[in-house]
C-alpha cells in the first residue's frame, strides 16, 4: 500500500461530502487544483532531492485525485436524462479506465524519451493538463444551487477515514497463507 492509495481511498468520501455541502463545481476544481499542485511538488522533489517532499506531494496529489472521479460521476448522474444515464456513467468509467492505461503508457514513453533519471517529467505533464481542466471547468461547468445539507459529521468522517485506512493496512499486511485455526 502506498501513501497515494491510502490518501486516495480516505479522501473519496470526504470530497464527496464536501461536494454535497459546498457544490460540485468548486470542490471538483479544488480537487483538480490539488492534483496539479501535488504533481508539481512531486516533480520539484526530484529537483531538490527530497524524498519526504515526494511522499507529502503524493499525498496531496491523491487527495485531489480522490475528488475527481466521484464528483464527475455524480455530476453525470444528475445532469444527464435518466434514459441516457447508463450510457453516460459507462462512458465516465470507460474514460477513467482508459486514462489509467494511457497514463502508465505515457509515463513509460516519457521515461524513454528523457531517461529514467528525469522521472520528474512524469509528474510535470499533469500540471498544464490540470490548468486546462480548471480553465474549462470555470467556463463550462454549471453552477448548481446547493440544497441545504446537514452539517458535516466530523467525528463520522474521522472514524470512516480511520476505518478505511485500517482496513487497507490490515488487508495488505495479513498473511493469508499463515492463518492459524
Segments the model singles out, each with a brief description of its role:
Residues 5, 11, 130-133, 160-163:
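Alpha-helical transmembrane segments of integral membrane proteins
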Residues 15, 103, 164:
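ATP/adenylate-binding site constellation spanning eukaryotic-like Ser/Thr protein kinases
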Residues 2, 72, 137, 166-170:
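Hydrophobic/aromatic residues in alpha-helical transmembrane segments
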Residues 1-2, 97:
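Short, contiguous strand/loop micro-motifs
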Residues 2-16, 69-73:
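Central cavity-lining transmembrane alpha-helices of secondary-active solute carriers
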Residues 145-146, 161-181:
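Phenylalanine-glycine-rich, low-complexity intrinsically disordered regions
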Residues 19-155:
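Helix-loop-helix hairpins in multi-pass membrane proteins, especially solute transporters
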Amino acid at each position: 500500500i502506498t501513501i497515494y492509495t491510502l490518501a486516495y481511498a480516505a479522501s473519496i468520501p470526504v470530497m464527496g461530502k464536501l461536494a454535497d455541502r459546498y457544490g460540485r463545481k468548486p470542490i471538483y476544481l479544488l480537487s483538480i487544483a490539488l492534483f496539479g499542485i501535488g504533481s508539481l511538488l512531486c516533480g520539484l522533489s526530484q529537483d531538490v532531492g527530497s524524498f519526504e517532499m515526494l511522499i507529502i506531494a503524493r499525498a496531496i496529489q491523491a487527495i485531489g485525485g480522490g475528488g475527481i472521479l466521484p464528483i464527475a460521476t455524480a455530476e453525470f448522474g444528475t445532469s444527464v436524462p435518466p434514459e441516457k444515464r447508463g450510457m453516460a456513467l459507462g462512458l465516465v468509467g470507460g474514460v477513467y479506465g482508459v486514462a489509467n492505461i494511457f497514463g502508465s503508457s505515457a509515463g513509460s514513453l516519457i521515461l524513454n524519451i528523457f531517461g529514467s533519471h528525469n522521472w520528474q517529467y512524469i509528474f510535470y505533464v499533469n500540471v498544464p493538463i490540470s490548468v486546462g481542466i480548471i480553465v474549462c471547468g470555470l467556463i463550462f461547468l454549471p453552477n448548481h444551487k446547493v440544497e441545504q445539507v446537514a452539517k458535516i459529521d466530523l467525528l463520522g468522517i474521522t472514524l470512516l477515514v480511520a476505518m478505511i485506512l485500517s482496513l487497507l493496512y490490515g488487508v495488505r499486511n495479513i498473511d493469508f497463507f499463515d492463518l492459524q485455526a
